[in-house]
Structure formats: C-alpha cells, structure tokens
C-alpha cells in the first residue's frame, strides 16, 4: 500500500512539474522600419531601410529582438534602371558585406562584421523598454554615432546605432502589435525582400523612377515549427531620375504607418464580394491567417490571377477581407519564419 501511495505521489509531482513547464505567458510582437533615401547622390539611387522585430512581455520589456537592413542601391547613370536587379539584406550578406576590420571606432582593435555587431545590439536591448532604448547614449566617432556604454562596445558593437535604436523603438511602440501566448522554446525571425521591377528609365521628355520596393515580415515560431504570431509591412520609396542622375526622393511612411492615407480601400474588388479594405487591414488579416502554419505552408499558399493580381484562393482568407495580391506577403513571412532563431 505504501508503495502504491509513493508511486501516486511521484506521479502527481511529475504532472505538477509538467504543468509548470507548460505554463504560457502573454507577449506582443511588434515591427518597426526606419527608412532613409539621404545617401542617394548623382548617379546612385539608394534606399537604406532598417527593420526591427521585437517580442515584448506583459511589462513592456524586450524579450527578443531581431534587426536587419535592406541597403538597396542602383546605378542610374544616364537615366537607366535595372528592373531585374536583385538585392540581399546585410544579414543575408553576412561576411560578404565586408565591414570586419575596416573601422575601429572605439579604438579597442576589435572590428567585427556587420551581422555580428547587429547581433550584439539585439542581445543588448533584451530586458529594456522602449523608453530605455530611446535613451541609449551615443557619442561621435569617425563621423558615426556609436554607443557610450562599455557593455555594448565590449560586446563588439562599435558601429553607428541610431537607426537600430529608432527601428527598435518603433517596433516597441507598434500600434498594430499582435498579442500571443506562448510557453518556452519560441523563436523570432525578421526578413526583408526587395524588388526594382517597377522602376522606369528616364527619357528625353520625362523623368524616370528608381523604385526599390521592399516587403518586411516578422514571425514568432513555436517549438513545433508553427507560427504563433506574424506581422508584415511594405515601403515604396520613389527616387526620380533624369539623364543627369538623381532628381529627388519621395518617401512618407510605410504602408501600415500610412493607414487610410494609402488609399487602397474601395479601389479594386478582386474577388467580387464588394469588400475592398485598406492595405493595413488586409495585411492584418493575412498576418492572422498564417498563425498555426509552418513556413512551408505559408510559402505554399495557393493563388489565382484576378485583375492582374495574384490573390488568395482560400475562401477563409478572402472572407477575412484580404483580397489583394499576397505573393510578396507570403514570401516575406515565410522567410521570416525560416530565419527565426
């Protein structure tokens, strides 16, 4: 009898421990983009977009952070454009980016590659709030605004961090952040996919445009490989060019930031249900739809061509109000899920 009681008590303890291990907590996923066209000059059109994804706990502190930069450049000499040009982000370039050993901003002899320095910053902001990230002190070194804190410098991040800070703060303060519950073992990924396909060359009569558009995605992936939360956004900066080079650059905000100003609502009824929502609403519907799916399942979402747009086939997604083209959305969210670490 004593043996049976002992076994039962042991079993209860194991069940209790398992229950504790499986306890879920409340989190939020936020996405932020800081974009500049300021480096465009003469025959070079350039867009620098820093994207950050953060997971916040219930107290607003960063639990995980991921950062990348889409630094897209195009030679526009003579007003020409390359619509087939492909782009890699700085994280994707890795050691190919070529920063290691170039500039010793803080004089310690340690000059790491861009991705290593970005990883150090990601780790540094864990446990901080948006206000604390915003308040990170910087100093000028070799024309760069680098950290003052020795903890960050000694971790190997001695490059300029102001765009990192801005993107992370935007992600923390994301008004469209999505809530989710999770236990242990989840990972976070961020991705950016760019195209120049809609660029136009300058002619003798009219300016052209170097349109380096980018889709951004963030995904939280559970231990089972399924998406727990996702977000996406997009930027469409337009850089006017002539035969003499860059004329002017125009960028206001991301599509999510523009909200109703983007002006998609009521324009195209792709699936004939008379529901024509704004871009940010359709984006949110897509993000909600992919929860519970794997990266492969998102990448494999079936599409159909309607009004020259590749829209969803799935009636649940269409009924949720997402009837716009989803090829860019599914590609970048799937990539973010694959990049989760």
What are these regions (language model features)?
Residues 24-341:
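Active-site- and interface-proximal helix/loop "cap" or "latch" segments in soluble metabolic
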Residues 1-11:
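Positively charged n-region of N-terminal signal peptides that target proteins for export
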Residues 16-19:
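C-terminal motif of bacterial Sec signal peptides marking the signal peptidase cleavage site
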Residues 1, 21-23:
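Long, contiguous C-terminal modules that act as interaction/assembly or targeting platforms
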């Amino acid at each position: 009898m004593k043996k049976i009681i002992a076994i039962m008590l042991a079993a209860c303890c194991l069940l209790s421990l398992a229950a504790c291990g499986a306890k879920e907590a409340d989190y939020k996923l936020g996405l932020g983009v800081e974009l500049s066209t300021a480096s465009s000059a003469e025959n070079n059109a350039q867009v620098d977009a820093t994207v950050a994804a953060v997971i916040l706990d219930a107290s607003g502190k960063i639990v995980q952070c991921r950062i990348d930069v889409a630094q897209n450049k195009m030679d526009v000499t003579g007003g020409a454009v390359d619509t087939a040009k492909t782009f890699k982000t700085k994280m994707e370039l890795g050691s190919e980016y070529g920063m290691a050993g170039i500039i010793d901003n803080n004089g310690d002899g340690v000059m790491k590659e861009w991705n290593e320095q970005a990883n150090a910053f990601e780790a540094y902001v864990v446990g901080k709030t948006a206000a604390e990230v915003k308040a990170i002190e910087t100093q000028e070194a070799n024309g760069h605004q680098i950290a003052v804190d020795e903890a960050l410098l000694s971790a190997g991040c001695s490059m300029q961090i102001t765009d990192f800070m801005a993107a992370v703060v935007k992600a923390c303060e994301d008004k469209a952040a999505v809530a989710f519950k999770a236990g242990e073992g989840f990972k976070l990924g961020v991705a950016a996919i760019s195209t120049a396909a809609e660029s136009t060359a300058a002619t003798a009569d009219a300016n052209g445009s170097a349109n380096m558009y980018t889709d951004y995605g963030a995904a939280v992936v559970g231990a089972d490989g399924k998406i727990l939360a996702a977000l996406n956004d997009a930027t469409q900066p337009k850089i006017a060019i002539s035969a003499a080079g860059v004329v002017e650059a125009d960028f206001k905000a991301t599509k999510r930031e523009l909200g109703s100003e983007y002006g998609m609502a009521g324009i195209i009824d792709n699936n004939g249900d008379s529901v024509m929502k704004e871009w940010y609403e359709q984006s949110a519907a897509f993000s909600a739809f992919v929860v519970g799916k794997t990266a492969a399942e998102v990448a494999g979402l079936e599409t159909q061509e309607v009004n020259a747009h590749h829209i969803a086939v799935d009636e649940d997604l269409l009924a949720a109000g997402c009837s716009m083209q989803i090829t860019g959305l599914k590609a970048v969210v799937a990539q973010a899920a694959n990049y989760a670490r």
